[in-house]
UniProtKB/Swiss-Prot annotation:
PROSITE patterns: PG_MUTASE. The record marks 182 as: Transition state stabilizer. It catalyses: (2R)-2-phosphoglycerate = (2R)-3-phosphoglycerate. Catalyzes the interconversion of 2-phosphoglycerate and 3-phosphoglycerate. It comes from Burkholderia thailandensis (strain ATCC 700388 / DSM 13276 / CCUG 48851 / CIP 106301 / E264). This is 2,3-bisphosphoglycerate-dependent phosphoglycerate mutase.
Length: 250
């Protein structure tokens, strides 16, 4: 049996402000830093260790990983930084308040933009300052692969090559793997691993800063998965994520 641990970054400044973040490189709040440190302590106390870690090129995930490694005394563990683990690109919604956007367009439309599988938000113009072109993080990524908006289907297509070419082989080689990423890049992986339908993925919410453990068989098919931490607190955190895109959340 193999184990894989996924963790969404701790609360970011734009999580706190209830804004669509996507590829905008915002940092953690003090609460987010605390959540990440607590996740590291939970993993250490539960006896986990890691041989390799994967994260995105966005600082909220990178810093979360740093905190986890620090608490576990694993700062030496090699880290793979990949744009493929970035948050889903929210296009023209990037930076907008979720509740205000819902008040303008309706809860249902914003839910579709946030959680549907194959409907992307309106795209950025290529000349928009929020577009990824020219960002040194993506200097080695072909321009045609850089998105101006994404739906979850696009995010799955972006994440899976990294899974197939690097993460899955590492797991099969017996390495203990940690992935520190984002709500939607983790949703993409969970959808793939668990075979969740396009319709059912709408209801999946990933809480900030809570380790999600997968136990996998020899074919990397999930045997079971579970969060580490207090179940009641985790349920509240998931409910809060679900509430973010509603007009009443303002």
């Amino acid at each position: 049996m193999y184990k894989l641990v996924l963790i969404r970054h701790g609360e970011s400044t734009w999580n706190k402000e209830n804004r669509f973040t996507g590829w905008v490189d915002v940092d953690l709040t003090e609460q987010g830093n605390s959540e990440a440190r607590q996740a590291g302590l939970l993993l250490k106390e539960a006896g986990y260790t890691f041989d390799i870690a994967y994260t995105s090129v966005l600082k909220r995930a990178i810093r979360t990983l740093w905190h986890v490694q620090d608490q576990m005394d694993l700062m030496y563990v090699p880290v793979v930084h990949s744009w493929r683990l970035n948050e889903r690109h929210y296009g023209a919604l990037s930076g907008l308040n979720k509740a205000e956007t819902a008040a303008k367009y309706g809860d249902e439309q914003v839910l579709v933009w946030r959680r549907s599988y194959d409907t992307p938000p309106p795209a950025l113009e290529p000349t928009d300052e929020r577009a990824p072109y020219g960002d040194p993080r993506y200097a080695k990524v072909p321009r045609e692969q850089l998105p101006l908006t994404e739906c979850l289907k696009d995010t799955v297509a972006r994440v899976l090559p990294l899974w197939n070419e690097s993460i899955a082989p590492a797991v099969k080689a017996g390495k203990q793997v940690l992935i520190a990423a984002h709500g939607n890049s983790i949703r993409a992986l969970v959808k793939y691993l668990d075979g969740i339908s396009d319709a059912d993925i709408v209801g999946l919410n990933i809480p900030n800063g809570v380790p999600l453990v997968y136990e996998l068989d020899a074919n990397l098919t999930p045997i079971r998965h579970y969060y580490l931490g207090d179940p009641e607190a985790i349920a509240k955190a998931q409910a809060a994520v679900a509430q973010q895109g509603k007009a009443s959340a303002a």
